[in-house]
Amino acid sequence: MIRKFLTWDSNENVSLNSGEIPELKEGEALLKVESCGICGSDIKIIKHGNARVKSGQIIGHEIAGTITKISDTIKNLKIGDRISVGADVPCGECYYCNNGMANCCEINFAIGHQFEGGFNQYMVLNKLTIEKGPVRKISDMTDFDIASLAEPLACCINGYERAIFDSFETIVIFGAGPIGMMLASLAPTYKAKNVIIIDPNAQRLEQVVKMKLSTHTFNPFEVNIKNEIMKITSNNGANLVFTANAIRDIHETAISLLARRGVVNLFGGLPKDAEPITISSNFIHYREAYITGSHGSTPEQHKKALELLESGKVRGKDFITHIFPLSEIKKALETASSGDAIKVIIKPNL
């Protein structure tokens, strides 16, 4: 049986290919991919590469689909199961996996990186992914597009869980893209009184307001962000700040906004050639500030994300603005890069 799939090579090129579906090995299953979201990291891989992704790899890691074939030894899945698949696949044996930090696994395997991804009509799930990875069954009532959002939402949950505390009066989010909006959608869980979203894209800020994700929105080119935050917080500063972008100066600004014992989560990684940010150790010392980072998610966080989406506590459909068949993947990638979309979904079998 022939499948179609998208591969990336080291020259910033992507190509649509076709080939025989591989024979399953012991412990493997075949997934008919119904939905796969485009992540900013997919675009980053295409443009800049990634040490974990070899040329010719099938990328895409925000996945939902149906099991169509299993090897004889699999007991926890059956043909016809509808599932959501996340990205990070832990080994389950190293120090980090054994201490609740599976996304920091020493081996650091991931779907769409070392393992084939979801821009793919039929995807092979290997034994490690099935046994240790973020593979969760979904109900018959759950839309595949919604289920594919569990991966990025799980990363947002990880960001909050790295923030130490369980409530924050004022949360500031730099970036109104898909991640920024998902972070905002989780703010009520953390009892936020003020949710402030900052982005230069007026269209995205309008969408934030329409979705009722914030109490305040600002364009950083139109106002002095620090002054505005201090007005809102009676000069106390923000209790939690997320940098949902890859802009060096924003990382420095984010730290400067912190209240005493405030937390900043440097969610968006910077390009390799970015200059190091400057941090005042005295600011950290006297503010008792916490500077954290987060990347990826654990299988348990993927489970939590799926529960939020299936329960409707996070309204997944509000994030999806564009859907494309696999044959229009290049147009889909351009749309996802344009700033006009929130979440772009690929339907490989459309």
Region spans (language model):
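Mid-domain Rossmann-like dinucleotide-binding core that forms the NAD(H)/NADP(H) cofactor-binding site
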Residues: 140-222
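Short glycine-centered segments of the SAM/dcSAM-binding site in methyltransferase folds
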Residues: 82, 170, 262-263, 290
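Glycine-rich beta-strand-centered segment in the early N-terminal region that forms part
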Residues: 22-36, 49-95, 136-139
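NAD(P)H dinucleotide-binding glycine-rich loop of Rossmann-like/cofactor-binding domains
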Residues: 93-174
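C-terminal hydrophobic helical "lid"/dimerization subdomain
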Residues: 1, 252-256, 260, 298-350
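ADP-ribose/adenylate-binding Rossmann-like module
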Residues: 258-274
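C-terminal substrate-binding/catalytic core of Rossmann-like NAD(P)-dependent dehydrogenases/reductases
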Residues: 226-231, 272-321, 330-331
